[in-house]
């Protein structure tokens, strides 16, 4: 079970005492979003009556893999990281503009640190 994304895999591997593999230097940036925020945004879209037909479901905030590792360490977890050679297929930075969805969705987003903590607490109960 490799997980469904970097955060999921990093937390599960940390819990199991496995090494987290990071391709490159860990400075690749991604736009992570908490699942509850995705659900709330989708509900906002179901009720949307406007003219736009395309929306980015995103946090509009970039976070690197190194940042994620640091957050796990601040939660007093002990992730063990192995850095592997960078892959040419990995984009350095992916951050989506969420201005359009936020214009119809007025609920503040869950900060990434809180989302990671929430997921970790939920996962501990499930394992």
What is the role of each PLM region?
Residues 14-127:
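C-terminal substrate-binding subdomain of Rossmann-fold SDR/epimerase-dehydratase oxidoreductases
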Residues 1-6:
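Flexible, glycine-rich beta-alpha linker
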């Amino acid at each position: 079970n490799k997980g469904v994304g970097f955060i999921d895999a990093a937390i599960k591997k940390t819990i199991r005492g496995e090494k987290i593999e990071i391709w490159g230097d860990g400075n690749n940036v991604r736009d992570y979003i908490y699942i509850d925020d995705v659900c709330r945004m989708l509900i906002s879209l179901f009720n949307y009556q406007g003219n736009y037909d395309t929306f980015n479901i995103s946090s509009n905030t970039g976070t690197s893999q190194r940042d994620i590792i640091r957050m796990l360490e601040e939660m007093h977890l002990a992730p063990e990281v192995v850095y592997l050679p960078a892959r040419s297929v990995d984009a350095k930075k992916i951050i989506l503009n969420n201005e359009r969805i936020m214009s119809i969705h007025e609920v503040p987003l869950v900060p990434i640190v809180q989302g990671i903590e929430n997921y970790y607490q939920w996962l501990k109960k499930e394992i």
